[in-house]
Amino acid sequence: MSCSGGNCGCGSSCSCGSGCGGCRMLTDLGEERSSTSQTMIMGVAPQKGHFEELETAAGSDNGCKCGSNCTCDPCNCK
């Protein structure tokens, strides 16, 4: 997920935006990766693309709060 280009910016109303690159929503994906090999079995349903997810989440400002140094705390824009 992301908001406004992947950044939670600290704007005047402490909303999602690109005011400053406080926290990137896509960094959470790195935690799901591991160094071991994994096998994925895909079903018959088409895989949802990342662009669709970005479009769905773009422009949303729920749950984005400003912390110190113009960072988001927590960075959980929905």
Swiss-Prot record:
Keyword Membrane in annotation: no
Q: Which domain of life is it from?
A: Eukaryota
Please provide the record's keywords in A-Z order. Metal-binding, Metal-thiolate cluster
Query: What are this entry's molecular-function GO terms?
Result: metal ion binding
Please give the start and end residues of each transmembrane region: none
Q: Which PANTHER family match?
A: METALLOTHIONEIN-LIKE PROTEIN 2A, METALLOTHIONEIN-LIKE PROTEIN 2B
Function summary: Metallothioneins have a high content of cysteine residues that bind various heavy metals.
The text of the family note is:
Belongs to the metallothionein superfamily. Type 15 family.
Q: What is this protein called?
A: Metallothionein-like protein type 2
Q: Which organism is it from?
A: Musa acuminata (Banana)
